[in-house]
Amino acid sequence: MTAPAVPPGCPVRPTDTHGLTPLSATTGPDPARVHQELRETWGSVARVELEPGVPAWLVLGYRELLTVTRQEKTYSRDARNWRDLAEGAVPPGSALLPMMAHRDNVIGYDGPEHQRLRRPLVDGMAGTDQRRLRRSVEAVCAGLLESFTGRGTADLVGEYARVVPLLAIGGLFGLDRSEGHELLRSLAALFSGPNASRAGSRRFEDILTGILRERRAAPESDLTSAFLAHPDLRGDSEILQSMVVMISAGNETTTSWIANTLRLMLTDRRFRGRLRGGRLGEDEALDEVLWQDPPMANFPARYALHDTELGGRAIRRGDCLVLGLAAANADPAVRPADPYDMLGNRAHLAFSAGPHACPARVPARLITRTAVEIALRGLPDVTLDVPAAELPWRPSPWTHCPASLPVRFTPLPAAAAAPGGGP
């Protein structure tokens, strides 16, 4: 750890990033070690570097994170309050901007405007037919398993965990499978470099605009029709942005949840034994993953609206604060040492907290639980095809998620992948 020791309460010059730990170090192979070293050096709020020359505060403490997420009049979600961005310290081509720049949607506002834009999302999730969604996810999962069960090998991230959520969420909006796969390709392009990103963004919005037009002409029982009818959404632009937020955010986080649950099954003998032996229910297993590896390890961001103090640190107006969801979950001030003491405990911060907490936790759990159930049933003797220490990790400062899960299993006939099938 190279972060300089600074006495609690001592202000840090906002432009000084010399020796600071890169935020990306907290999502590498051993994030717990990095979190521990940051706590030992800084306490519950640590100074880190987002990218060269761009500092931020990483909120490591559970109670401090609740303070930041619940006090909108002190900590804003609106990136237009970010001093380093406003003063040009963040370059126009920064890789931070896709996640952190202001967006004219529910993510980019606080207060009444945020509440107005959030209501359609909350109402849409409340109106989701859970049985219908589960049947849809089962069919998606079975189809994906069928594509590789006869082969005896697969990548359970690229061929499964990354595909299931987008097809399931796309289905909620009325997209068929071919449109869902095309949406997946456009999302991949979004993160493939500037030229491909622009083309991917255009295609992504084109697909959603198409379904928007179809549902305006002929409404159905899907989220697109619900958004069109919702009185709080004003015009196609707001409807489209709401769709983009739901699909992109839901896909990324649910992918990570599925991937990390499967990874634990393949690499953690204790976790696998408790789940397969019936000592750990499926929902308890999913909650253990949320405590240990939340879908977003770090979440951007809040921006101080005035000078304040947090965790013994002097926070200046315009400072950026990153929500360390994984670190806060592991805060020794609230986390018992014995994992058995966590069974049934959903006080984790995997979905954040406060007014901007995730509104889609119920469908996300349903999609994840179904995907894990069908993978375990359809691949009963699945094993990791590389040493656990050699698993690659996604190069992201935001998610602690394997880039791939190469596995091997006994080849099975296609029918074994269907819901209710298998040995």
Locate predicted features:
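Cytochrome P450
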Residues: M1-P423
